[in-house]
């Protein structure tokens, strides 16, 4: 007998959570795909971090980019493993397959949907697609509970559906802090390579796509008064436009390129302030990474990871208010104490990974 966990692919920012669900809840970990083809990830490095052997589901792929899948062995896995708990990927076809099996064969196992809805999506009717909106209305009442990344969304689901467990996308700081320490030599090289010695650094990490609101972010930088360098780590379809836009604002912006693993961690060590200006962001796992690295964070109120921000570790901004964003960045830059030496800063997360996982496991088992 084994509990079952289904998800589209292994994501680096969720591996610690996946490991905990495997070890603490006895889940067989099943995935549609080996990795997320839309992102440039270190697939081999992710596999090494897994404390489980992933099972990749057989089936028929369809949809744009073949990102969707009709999994042909779901009922076989349910029948052979006799689970008490089945965790499914929000409102996908597989979720319907699991629910049909439960209802047709009158099974008693608990179906829990892991859902990445942000508060902006549910509260402001700002779903990515109309299909997702209607799938929520259909499926949310049928599952037994929901694992939700944003505490505000948990409260919304509790109000509308009487269900919801808060499980933010967070890494285990016990593992991550030594990784930041290991990355310090790379951080020192960055300071030399990009002429950052003696300068305060504002950092963005992510894809250069419309949802990240980077055009408005760059325009807001043009309104700031403090002296700092902005480093943009990532790549994407809008890079050319953003480079052109940055030439006319009178502020220094470094387009550093795409990095993974220790290459990204080293940038968090260099940074003084982190920013996520997205206008549409289901979560934003980079916020957790920045906070563990000790970076005061200026985060869009539209991002799910806004739930990680307190008065002690950052501030929230309206992604459409350029003056407000500029003011928040200036205030953050005045607040932080810059050290020209590269050191690992104090963890600014408002809670510990184990505390969240222990609470989630307890609620799932109830």
Language model: regions and residue ranges:
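A short, histidine- and acid-enriched strand-loop-helix "catalytic/donor-clamping" loop
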Residues: 94, 109-129, 144-145
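Short alpha-helical donor nucleotide-sugar binding micro-motif in glycosyltransferases
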Residues: 258-259, 266-271
């Amino acid at each position: 007998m084994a509990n079952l966990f289904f998800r589209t692919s292994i994501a680096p920012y969720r591996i610690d959570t996946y490991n905990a669900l495997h070890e603490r809840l006895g889940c067989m970990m099943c995935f549609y795909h080996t990795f997320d083809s839309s992102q440039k990830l270190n697939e081999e490095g992710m596999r090494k971090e897994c404390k489980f052997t992933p099972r990749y589901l057989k089936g028929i792929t369809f949809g744009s980019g073949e990102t969707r899948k009709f999994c042909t062995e779901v009922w076989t896995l349910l029948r052979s493993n006799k689970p008490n708990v089945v965790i499914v990927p929000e409102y996908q076809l597989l979720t319907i397959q699991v629910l049909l099996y439960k209802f047709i064969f009158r099974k008693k196992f608990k179906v829990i949907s892991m859902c990445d809805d942000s508060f902006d999506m549910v509260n402001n009717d700002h779903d990515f697609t109309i299909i997702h909106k209607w799938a929520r209305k259909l499926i949310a009442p049928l599952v037994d509970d929901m694992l939700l990344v944003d505490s505000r969304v948990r409260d919304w689901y509790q109000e509308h559906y009487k269900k919801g467990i808060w499980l933010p996308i967070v890494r285990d700081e016990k593992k991550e802090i030594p990784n930041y320490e290991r990355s310090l030599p790379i951080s020192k090289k960055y300071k030399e390579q990009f002429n950052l010695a003696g300068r305060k650094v504002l950092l963005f990490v992510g894809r250069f796509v419309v949802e990240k609101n980077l055009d408005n972010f760059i325009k807001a930088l043009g309104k700031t008064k403090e002296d700092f360098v902005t480093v943009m780590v990532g790549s994407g379809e809008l890079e050319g436009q953003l480079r052109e836009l940055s030439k006319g604002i009178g502020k220094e912006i470094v387009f550093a390129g795409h990095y993974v693993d220790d290459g990204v961690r080293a940038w968090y060590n260099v940074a003084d302030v982190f920013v996520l200006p997205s206008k549409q962001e289901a979560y934003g796992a980079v916020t957790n990474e920045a906070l563990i690295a000790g970076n005061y964070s200026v985060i869009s109120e539209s991002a799910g990871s806004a739930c990680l921000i307190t008065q002690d570790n950052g501030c929230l901004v309206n992604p459409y208010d350029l003056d407000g964003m500029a003011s928040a960045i200036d205030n953050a830059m005045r607040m932080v104490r810059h050290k020209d030496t590269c050191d690992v800063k104090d963890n600014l997360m408002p809670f510990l990974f184990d505390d969240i996982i222990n609470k989630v496991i307890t609620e799932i088992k109830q």
